[in-house]
Swiss-Prot record:
Subcellular location: Cytoplasm, Cytosol
Consequence of gene disruption: Smaller rosettes, collapsed or tangled trichomes, postgenital fusions between the rosette leaves and flower buds, fusions between sepals, altered cuticle permeability, loss of cuticular folding in petals, abnormal flower and silique development, altered seeds surface, defective mucilage extrusion and semisterility. Increased susceptibility to salinity, osmotic and water deprivation stresses.
Family, similarity comment: Belongs to the plant acyltransferase family.
Enzyme class: transferase
Keywords from the UniProt entry: Acyltransferase, Cytoplasm, Transferase
Cellular compartments per GO CC: cytoplasm; cytosol
Enzyme Commission (EC) number: 2.3.1.-
Gly residues: compositionally biased ranges: 467-484
Function text: Required for incorporation of 9(10),16-dihydroxy-hexadecanoic acid into cutin.
Protein name: BAHD acyltransferase DCR
Catalytic site: H168 (proton acceptor), D394 (proton acceptor)
GO BP terms, alphabetized: cutin biosynthetic process; localization; plant epidermis morphogenesis; trichome morphogenesis
Amino acid sequence: MKIKIMSKTHVKPTKPVLGKKQFHLTTFDLPYLAFYYNQKFLLYKFQNLLDLEEPTFQNEVVENLKDGLGLVLEDFYQLAGKLAKDDEGVFRVEYDAEDSEINGVEFSVAHAADVTVDDLTAEDGTAKFKELVPYNGILNLEGLSRPLLAVQVTKLKDGLAMGLAFNHAVLDGTSTWHFMSSWAEICRGAQSISTQPFLDRSKARDTRVKLDLTAPKDPNETSNGEDAANPTVEPPQLVEKIFRFSDFAVHTIKSRANSVIPSDSSKPFSTFQSLTSHIWRHVTLARGLKPEDITIFTVFADCRRRVDPPMPEEYFGNLIQAIFTGTAAGLLAAHGPEFGASVIQKAIAAHDASVIDARNDEWEKSPKIFQFKDAGVNCVAVGSSPRFRVYEVDFGFGKPETVRSGSNNRFNGMMYLYQGKAGGISIDVEITLEASVMEKLVKSKEFLLSEEEEEDDGKKLTNGNGHVNGNGNGYVNGNGNGFV
């Protein structure tokens, strides 16, 4: 792919925000200093190709995006700021219109004249559009000297690619898509945004955590599984793929999970619990684990309504926490999707305000920043959410053709869920796995819900009668010491 960067500028709030604004990063924010910038990729196909001709593209399309960005930053001014820390190592995000070192949002314009929208939508992995998304391999900690948001708008042969990199120490997915929808709203002609962000982080957790920022020798090192403690082992080749579960497929999976009435009178399984159980089970089968091997499921859960007192949906920042659970691989394989869904449901239900506070208290006593190594042995970890209305982000030239995550923050077993382009309750699943495991997964008719499903897939991990040596109920509860 031939890409030419045409310009790189910075965008600040159109009307300067008066005074120096400072917000201490909370215990919900700080662990993400060790992660990489959170990348998003949106692809738009233009109906009127004349909008791609110069000077129209620069003078109208690009300038409208930049003008809208400047206006929306008046409300989301933290994104135009920078990370800072005091002498004790307490981190904050700050914005000061008078500070010459605060440049605002980085905004680049690029051209890829020979690339079409279809060229990019047909690609499974992120390699094809990696150059279209800024800040590959950049740690959030670098927000001390870099902008907290970088945008790259690339003109294609028949459309526009928008790559974004958000500093994950400053905001989570809910805040990201609140910002994106607000920016798009302004670009479509609104005089003001419909929903204001709630900016006071201290209402969620009012603590001053002092951090010892000793960077790891290799911040890019990631591992997952038996070889995590053996640095001499060559890391496996990882591949990425999108699985698109149609409205019908999601309904089918949910119906199957709920076809068995739980003996403990638990609630019906949600779409999320049913689908992620389906994926967890089939990834475990494809990995060919031993029946007694433990497999961990991790979900980054929104805690806005879980904390006490609850925070508004518009809370700007990170208000997520990892929930860990797990079971023996054989137990997961020997049962239908209701088993994994029950394990997931119980873990999520148990993660109430008291558990959240206890996790935060524990972390504050002994904070560890650089933990981007392992989400748990043989894990499947879930980020993003299909409830984010990503296909409604319309800047005035139509809804996106596709929405993806970038190449950052991927490891063996990591998956991102997005609202399906097909509508309804369809869900697109991006997942990263070892190449050999992915090959088995794409051949599984049962996983893909093909007309002819594979039979007795679960026998691969059982001892013949559907049982394994478990600990009674097969659950492994997370202790909060893993991936966050």
